[in-house]
Design a protein with these regions (language model features):
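Basic, polyanion-binding surface patches
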Residues: 1-209
Length: 209
């Protein structure tokens, strides 16, 4: 079955995140995005792909700051509220009944109750013929909800249930990861069986890993 361009998105499960920003007048905005991806390892940069006419993009251009929050699958209803095309003067936290999670470095808050929060500053914008924008953000702080960290220091994804979206012909299906029982170390991807980025945990006293 060959798929036309507007049907191809049904083939790839996509992450669901909430991006929160402040307008230059201080109005809080939050919007769902799935077209996001980290830029290689170590995870210092993240890319967001956006339509041109988005309040999120305008706010990032104006303030150079944003927060990416990773919601649980239980937050789909609130997420859908933020997907609507409200006026830029509307506080979307209030519309979706979302509580802010205070940031430590940037001004926009994250979304409370999420799995993780990435505080970001604008590194670069790549504008493609005024059709879409690629936002490159530098992660200046990343915090994970302690509730979802297992004894190995990994994300307990079956407990956290990070929301995943799969597009269909008439709408979106939401699900979350389930472990298959398979685990592979990063070193298995290298011929010398050494992961060049494995440096161990950072200073535990600082709370940074």
């Amino acid at each position: 079955l060959e798929l036309k361009p507007n049907k191809r998105e049904i083939t790839i499960p996509m992450p669901l995140v909430l991006i929160s920003t402040l307008s230059k007048n201080g109005v809080r905005n939050v919007a769902p995005y799935s077209n996001v991806m980290p830029i290689l390892r170590p995870w210092d940069l993240i890319a967001i792909f956006s339509w041109i006419k988005r309040d999120t993009l305008n706010n990032i251009r104006d303030t150079k700051e944003f927060v990416i929050s990773v919601p649980t699958a239980d937050m789909v209803n609130e997420t859908m509220v933020t997907s609507k095309n409200y006026s830029p003067t509307v506080d979307e936290f209030e519309m979706a009944n979302l509580k802010p999670y205070p940031s430590k470095i940037v001004k926009p808050p994250g979304v409370a109750g999420c799995i993780a929060w990435m505080e970001c500053v604008l590194e670069k914008e790549i504008l493609e013929e005024n059709k879409y924008s690629i936002i490159i953000g530098k992660i200046v702080r990343l915090e994970i909800n302690d509730e979802y960290v297992n004894k190995n220091g990994d994300l307990d994804f079956e407990k956290a249930k990070p929301a995943v979206m799969i597009c269909g012909n008439r709408g979106m299906y939401f699900t979350f990861p389930k472990w298959t029982g398979e685990f592979r170390e990063y070193s298995e991807m290298f011929l010398n069986s050494k992961d060049p980025l494995s440096g161990g945990d950072a200073d535990e006293d600082s709370g940074v890993r």
